Amino acid sequence: MPDPGNRRLLAFDFGTRRIGVASGQEMLGTGQPLAMLPARDGIPDWQQIEALLADWQPDIVLVGLPLNMDDTENEMCARARKFGKRLHGRYHVTVEMVDERLTSYEAKGEVMAGGGSRDFGRHGVDDRAAVLILETWCREQAG
């Protein structure tokens, strides 16, 4: 694995209908949206995940953890953790969970500020939320 500061990152914003994906470099501290993968009750097309991992070859995979505002966990936290464990178990990648409170809210704000569609049911923001998860992790590493 490369030295801290030089790692390739892939971030996932787990959801039951869609899973947002972003990539980035720790050195730059920024990410770019890659994809919004369809999911059926939180179960992705694992072949799509495998293809992304093969293409991007991340050193660390980040999975958003949607904690409550009082730091407690909820059902979605358990599902996101399970998704992270499956990523590690299937593909033997290093997985880190990242506090993602308010990332979807912030991503929706960015879309609306840019004049984008407010129909988030059809036009999700999950890939943008994954960017925010990645950037949050980078800021935490930088101290």
Swiss-Prot record:
What Gene3D superfamilies is this protein classified in? YqgF/RNase H-like domain
Any coiled-coil regions, as ranges: none
A GO BP annotation: rRNA 5'-end processing
Q: Which GO terms describe its molecular function?
A: nuclease activity
Task: Locate the transmembrane regions by residue number.
Answer: none
Q: Where would you find this protein in the cell?
A: Cytoplasm
UniProt keyword terms in alphabetical order: Cytoplasm, Hydrolase, Nuclease, Ribosome biogenesis
Q: Which GO terms describe its cellular component?
A: cytosol
Signal peptide range: none
Write the Enzyme Commission number(s) for this entry: 3.1.-.-
Q: Which SMART domains match?
A: YqgFc (SM00732)
User: Which Pfam family, an example, fits this chain?
Assistant: RuvX
Record family assignment = Belongs to the YqgF nuclease family.
Role description: Could be a nuclease involved in processing of the 5'-end of pre-16S rRNA.
PANTHER family named in the record: POLYNUCLEOTIDYL TRANSFERASE, RIBONUCLEASE H-LIKE SUPERFAMILY PROTEIN
* Listed name of the protein: Putative pre-16S rRNA nuclease
